[in-house]
Amino acid sequence: MANTQKLISVLGDSISTFDGYTPPGGVYYGPSFGSITGVYTPEDTWWMQVIRALDGALLANNSWSGSTVSMVGSLPACSPSRIRKLAAEGMTPDHILILAGLNDVNMYAEPQAFGADYQRMLQRIREAYPQADVTCGTLTTGYLSNTPFTHQLGHVRDRLDPYNQAIRAAAAAAGYRLADIARLDRRYASMDGLHPNGEGMKQMARFWLETTEDL
């Protein structure tokens, strides 16, 4: 019997990294930090939990810590080089999960420019993988929970709305699915207001699955 599992790729920032599964040099989560983050294995990540729930298999994860969608930062997700790496081993994804943009907010990227680059990213994804389903996640932030860190990045929360509106508009224009996490107005357990801990990863996965259109 043919394998009917969906091949799923992920495009994102530090929230979607894990050592050995995402590009080296841009990793935030990994087993050596599990005692701090509560994220010990890739099975603890939001994206692997979503992939399992969709009865899928990971093809590629091109997520980089500190990366942006727009050209305001380094390694923008709209760049062709990152989009090319959503394929692997001669195979292309059936489904792509995108959760990116918090670093654009943190770096005060101009929302209109962010929206234009998000649209450009989706256009390039369509050109590279015309048969792929794509789900775009809106942005939310976390609350501090069981963390040794005192530095909180939750100030980003107050500036999310225009970026989320840009993501919604870009997904609608491209005809792609939206995981509108922001509309829930709920937060996840985090270490610093942005990076989920183990419990926060479970919450993020639930939020994603609860809000994704037409799964």
Question: Where is each model-derived feature located?
Answer:
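Extracellular cell-wall/glycan-interacting regions and their flexible linkers
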Residues: 1-5, 215
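Short hydrophobic segments within beta-strands
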Residues: 11-12, 137
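Short active-site segment of divalent metal-dependent hydrolases/proteases
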Residues: 15-16
